[in-house]
Swiss-Prot record:
Domain KRAB intervals: 4-75
Expressed in which tissues: Expressed in bone marrow and in monocytic and immature erythroid cell lines.
Function: May function as a transcription factor. Seem to have a transcriptional repression activity.
GO cellular component: nucleus
Family the entry assigns: Belongs to the krueppel C2H2-type zinc-finger protein family.
Species annotation: Homo sapiens
Pfam families listed in its UniProt record: KRAB, zf-C2H2, zf-H2C2_2
Protein name, entry field: Zinc finger protein 253
Coiled-coil stretches: none
ZnF bounds (C2H2-type): 172-194, 200-222, 228-250, 256-278, 284-306, 312-334, 340-362, 368-390, 396-418, 424-446, 452-474
Length: 499
């Protein structure tokens, strides 16, 4: 046998057979023939380009043989192969044409055995064929029968797709990284990662992508289109994957479980982030100062310390913030939005932390105790503020007048006395105030709300100061008995002022 040629691994059609093929079959044929040619070139077997390959590359009909020559050459089939598979199970011209060329490989090349379901099971004895088999991850000569459906498949009539579906094997492998895929088209797309090719460009902003699907998804940023809608709550998304993730909120599904502690998550990315808690790993490092963080978002937040920038501006009042979340919270001052509501009394708050703090009022819990005097408080911030009474610390200084304060928020309010700024406006009467708390108190004039109630007689008041004045009536009638030092430390201020 002579050296392996392209003709040995090529399939040729008559005009009649070619016209019997549909578009998908023609495209498949073209892809496989060109792939065969490239493999032979890779092995150094083919030097000159065959006419068939030229026709296929130019999109022409691949009719390299004369019509009468093709008609005069009926398929020469092995007797056993013909008995098992021909003509009952092979009904279309596509399969017939494919089989013709392989049957032309005579018995000195392929030793067919009776009852064998795969020509690929027989060893190819000639060196040229062995070289080709080593190059091709999938034997291009393989013709096999599926016992499950009783149909004959061939590589060129989607046998690879068929085998992948039934075996789960990824047939198309990337030479660069070794990753395997079920479809050649997926492999072609994947290769662009290595080449850096991004042929799909957004006309709106110029951003380029590897895949057309990614460009389609990207365009929705400009159009605002959200085609994927949740049937449960009506929320819409730009990507189907985001909708899939969102649905787990309704189903409660948490398929991603931490092997270390058993905690489960909706998304694999959340699990990956969580695992850092156990490892203590801090893979995200600030290039400016070298400080490391567990999450990339923390690095982004940290970097603003170096730039000192405040990129997030309030359109309403012009105030700037370092973080987008702080701007979102700030906007609630202007909108009056209070999304966090107490189930006990119905009071609503701007921040979830304020609601958490408020709930302690209902429980009466005072977990924060001063080490200096033993006084207990509902909140850690109140304790921290109280401790400054003992230390006398006032670290926040006004540049205008030199006055110092225990808290930065109090300093901010104080500064407005110099600037005259009154950002908090009453929608009811138009009156403006320097502090949001003053506006809240003022609104009670319009609403008639009296949240401060005397525990002794049940009388209610608009302001806490009025309640304190009222309490003196009851205190004057009752002596305050001091039994120990702790009671002395906790003498009500109102009683001290009366005595």
């Amino acid at each position: 046998m002579g050296p392996l040629q392209f003709r040995d691994v090529a399939i040729e059609f008559s005009l009649e057979e070619w016209h019997c093929l549909d578009t998908a079959q023609r495209n498949l044929y073209r892809d496989v023939m060109l792939e065969n040619y490239r493999n032979l070139v890779f092995l150094g077997i083919v030097v000159s380009k065959p006419d068939l390959v030229t026709c296929l590359e130019q999109g022409k009909k691949p009719l390299t043989m004369e019509r009468h020559e093709m008609i005069a050459k009926p398929p020469v089939m092995s007797s056993h192969f013909a008995q098992d598979l021909w003509p009952e199970n092979i009904q279309n011209s596509f399969q017939i044409g494919m089989l013709r060329r392989y049957e032309e490989c005579r018995h000195d090349n392929l030793q067919l055995k009776k009852g064998c379901k795969s020509v690929g099971e027989h060893k190819v004895h000639k060196g040229g064929y062995n070289g080709l088999n080593q190059c091709l991850t999938t034997t291009q000569k393989e013709i096999f029968q599926c016992d499950k459906y009783g149909k004959v498949f061939h590589k060129f009539s989607n046998s690879n797709t068929y085998k992948t579906r039934h075996t789960g094997i990824n047939l198309f492998k990337c030479i660069i990284c070794g990753k395997a895929f079920k479809r050649s088209s997926t492999l072609t797309t994947h290769k662009k990662i290595h080449t850096g090719e991004k042929p799909y460009r957004c006309e709106e902003c110029g951003k380029a992508f590897n895949q057309s699907a990614n460009l389609t998804t990207h365009k929705r940023i400009h159009t605002g289109e959200k085609p994927y809608r949740c049937e449960e709550c009506g929320k819409a998304f730009k990507q189907s994957s985001n909708l899939t993730t969102h649905k787990k909120i309704h189903t409660g599904e948490k398929p991603y479980k931490c092997e270390e502690c058993g905690k489960a998550f909706n998304r694999s990315t959340d699990l990956t982030t969580h695992k850092i808690v156990h490892t203590g790993e801090k893979p995200y490092k600030c290039e400016e100062c070298g400080k490391a963080f567990k999450h990339p978002s923390h690095v982004t937040t940290h970097k603003k310390i170096h730039t000192r920038g405040k990129p997030y501006n309030c359109e309403e009042c012009g105030k700037s913030f370092k973080h987008c979340s702080n701007l979102t919270i700030h906007k609630r001052i202007h909108t009056g939005e209070k999304p966090y509501k107490c189930e006990e009394c119905g009071k609503a708050f701007h921040l979830s932390s304020h609601l958490t703090t408020h709930k302690i009022l209902h429980t009466g819990e005072k977990p924060y105790r001063c080490r200096e005097c033993g006084k207990a408080f509902n909140h850690s911030t109140t304790l921290f503020s109280h401790e400054k009474i003992h230390t006398g610390e006032k670290p926040y200084k006004c540049d205008e007048c030199g006055k110092t304060f225990t808290w930065p928020s109090i300093l901010s309010k104080h500064k407005r006395t110099h600037t005259g700024e009154k950002p908090y406006k009453c929608e009811e009467c138009g009156k403006s105030f320097t502090a949001s708390s003053t506006l809240t108190t003022h609104k009670r004039i319009h609403t008639g709300e009296k949240p401060y109630k005397c525990e002794e007689c049940g009388k209610a008041f608009n302001w806490s100061s009025d309640l304190n004045k009222h309490k003196k009536i009851h205190i004057e009638r009752k002596p305050y008995i001091v039994k120990n030092v702790t009671d002395l430390l906790n003498v009500p201020p109102l009683l001290i002022s009366i005595r």
